[in-house]
Amino acid sequence: MRPESHMHPRGRPPWDEERRAALEKVISSLVGLSSRDLIIVEGLKDSNSLRRLGVKAEIITTNSARRVMRLERDDRLLARDVKIVLLPDFDREGREKIRRWKSELSGGRAIDMTTWRVLRSLLKSEGIGIEGLARIAGKLGLLRKEMWLDPDEMIRRARFR
């Protein structure tokens, strides 16, 4: 029998190891972003969930296209080594936002939409969005008491903005 920490938060059958490992890999890549990198999310709950995981990248919350357009003119985006990750919600509106954000921000820069696609494939059927990412990580034993458990390094405290 699997440990209880691998149970789905709603008491459904446990996540299989392959799916759990895929989620762990995505979370690890988010935690591994530098403070120069940017993550764009829709709301404050999304941002707070990422901070609970220990994400150090700058997180920009926006529900408005105007904020994204202002961001397009931001000097930080001129640097080619800045990674930009788009993480809107997984609903139809989120799919529209990710396309719009990508076209408004790309300007020859690489925009990471793969992280969103992988998270959507892992979480959408469970009714979990970006705002629930830290919660599911905790339920699966990847996060304990505001600490991200990275198998390759020491436990470190998550930083809140």
Predicted regions and their residues:
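TOPRIM fold recognition
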Residues: 2-10, 52-53, 62-161
